[in-house]
Amino acid sequence: EAAARGWDPISANFLLNKWVKSHWPKYVEGCERVGRPADPANWRVAKSVFVSDDMATAKEYALGAQSPYRYYYSQLLTKMKKHGRANLFKADQNMSDDEVTLDRVLEDCVIFGTPDKVADDILALRDNVGDFGTLLYAGKDWADVELGRNSMILLAEKTMPLVNAAIGTTKASQ
């Protein structure tokens, strides 16, 4: 319905890839209904991303006990389970709610690592969900200002040029 009204899609950072992937066909359907071209360049996909110069720092900041990503997803998972919506995080809808753990959610929803690894993960995301126009960096509270700032710089200056080279674009916003 949103596409038929002229709106462009944004897929949320807390969604499993299987849900993100389901957005494109619905967008196409809405566009076709009103004779509007469906352009993947208009699709924005948000992801929780953390980039660091070294893998150990990236892993600790993304997954560790004091991680802002852990805090964010802990809050979200707790609320979803409380209100009977844990299925949002289930790769298989037959899983029990107890099988939906915070560690599993972090593994499924957070892209982290060195610039090269994050580039590979973003390209794998595109392979999984399909072509999209813009990656939206879903920011979290910075538990460490320098690491948070450096993550954004590394993403812009190191990771995205690798991604853009691989997909054949030079658009800085992607």
Locate predicted features.
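A conserved active-site cap/scaffold subdomain adjacent to cofactor or substrate pockets
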Residues: E1-W24, V28
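Hydrophobic faces of well-ordered beta-strands that scaffold small-molecule active sites
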Residues: W7-A12, A41-K47, G133-Y137
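An alpha-helical appendage that flanks or caps ligand/catalytic pockets
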Residues: K18-V129, N164-Q174
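Glycine-rich, proline-tolerant flexible connector loops at the mouths of alpha/beta enzymes
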Residues: N13-L15, L136-R149
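A short, mixed-charge helix-start or loop-turn motif at secondary-structure junctions
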Residues: P9, R104-D108, D141
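Short, solvent-exposed amphipathic alpha-helical segments in soluble enzyme
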Residues: G6, G64-S67, I153
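Short glycine/threonine-rich loop-to-helix capping motif typified by GTGT followed
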Residues: D54-A56, V145-L155
